[in-house]
A protein has these predicted regions:
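Intrinsically disordered, low-complexity repeat and linker tracts
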Residues: 1-21, 189-192
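Compositionally biased, intrinsically disordered/low-complexity regions enriched for serine, proline
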Residues: 2, 6-9, 61, 129, ...
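Intrinsically disordered, low-complexity segments enriched in proline/serine/threonine
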Residues: 7, 11-14, 66, 134, ...
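Core segments of small alpha/beta cavity-forming domains
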Residues: 15-119
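Intrinsic-disorder/low-complexity regions
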Residues: 17, 116, 139, 183-184
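Surface-exposed, charged secondary-structure patches
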Residues: 105-156
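Short beta-strand edge/turn micro-motifs at domain boundaries
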Residues: 148, 165-192
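Short, cysteine-centered beta-strand-loop-beta hairpins and adjacent loop/turn segments enriched
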Residues: 152-166
Length: 192
């Protein structure tokens, strides 16, 4: 019946207010990457908490530091590495502080407790509410999806002054690997 609505194929260079141009698997991957970004770009402990891993204590609820600035978690490094690699490619992780922030310490994950990226200047909740992120599809094939995250910021960042919104565009790329879709280039409005 021609009166039934049908999904139209995603159009390159079209701007979207959501990620509807991605498949369900790709949207879930993006969500997982976004959730992981708070630890990958922010403080590593954020990711460990999100994934339910606990700090190893010395029995008195004190958190011992190992080496300089690292805390030990109750997960094997192999398990953690497998989980992070189910989201990101090595290429993507190499462009972050991953190798410095998360270390293999006698088979467990040691996390640098204070290393993090600064938030992008002008990142405010008010701007995000008034000007939510949008996306521009660049390429969508069976092997690769590229799109642009269009982020909005306030030049002044002050509540007292009127908004002076500016835009930064960030590339995002997903690639099909032998193990499924992975994020190969990733950015967020919060960390750039």
């Amino acid at each position: 019946d021609s009166s039934e609505p049908s999904a139209s194929p995603a159009q390159p260079e079209q701007e979207y207010t959501d990620l509807s141009f991605l498949s369900e698997e790709q949207r879930q991957l993006y969500t997982n990457a976004y959730d992981a970004s708070f630890g990958l770009y922010g403080e590593g402990a954020n990711l460990m908490d999100k994934w339910g891993y606990k700090v190893v204590t010395d029995g008195s609820d004190s958190v011992p530091f190992i080496e300089d600035h690292y805390t030990l978690y109750n997960v094997s490094f192999d398990e953690f590495s497998e989980r992070i690699h189910s989201i990101f490619t090595d290429n993507c992780l190499t462009s972050t502080d991953y190798a410095i922030k998360f270390k293999n310490y006698n088979g467990r994950v040691a996390v640098h407790f204070s290393l993090h990226n600064e938030m992008v200047a002008g990142m405010t909740i008010y701007v995000q509410e008034q000007y939510p992120d949008t996306y521009r599809l660049v390429k969508n094939t069976s092997e690769e999806v590229e799109f642009t995250l269009i982020s909005h910021y306030d030049r002044d960042g002050s509540v007292e002054n009127p908004l002076e919104v500016y835009i930064i565009e960030y590339p995002i790329r997903m690639v099909k690997t032998d193990y499924g879709w992975r994020i190969d280039d990733f950015h967020t409005s919060r960390y750039g």
